[in-house]
Amino acid sequence: MGLTEIMLVLVSLAFVATAAAHDCQNGTRPASEEKREGCDYYCWNTETKSWDKFFFGNGERCFYNNGDEGLCQNGECHLTTDSGVPNDTDAKIEETEEELEA
């Protein structure tokens, strides 16, 4: 195999790897990740032979398998449904109610 053929094979492999990695970019939800809970996902990097971590874009819908739903913000899923777990707002309301009763 001559140098030209080797270069052609290498360029072709690079193109295929780039096309495959196109689905794995920050901010884009690959079709393979439609059922992924939370706001992060991993894609196999054939060059480094390791997993690369990516994040869904801000405003992207996110969910958890228990039914909670939210929106991604800076790589975290901020819930828009009541999860039944107290949050900072609940604590402030409770403090205000106690102050009013006193």
Curated annotation (Swiss-Prot):
It comes from the Eukaryota. Salivary gland (at protein level). Saliva (at protein level). Midgut. It holds the Pfam family TSGP1. Disruption phenotype: RNAi-mediated knockdown results in impaired feeding of adult ticks, observed as decline in the engorgement weights. No significant effects on the ability of nymphs to feed. Induction: Up-regulated in salivary glands and midgut following blood feeding. This is Salivary protein Salp9. The lineage of its organism: Eukaryota, Metazoa, Ecdysozoa, Arthropoda, Chelicerata. Does not show anticoagulant activity in in vitro assays. Keywords: Glycoprotein, Secreted, Signal. Residues 83-102 are annotated as: Disordered. Salivary protein that facilitates blood feeding of adult ticks on vertebrate species. Inhibits the lectin pathway of complement system activation in the host. InterPro entries: Ixonnexin-like. Belongs to the salp14 family. The keyword Zinc-finger does not apply. Residues 1-21 form the signal peptide. It is found in: Secreted. Glycans are attached at N26, N87. One of its GO terms (cellular component) is extracellular region. Its main location: secreted. Coiled coil: none annotated.
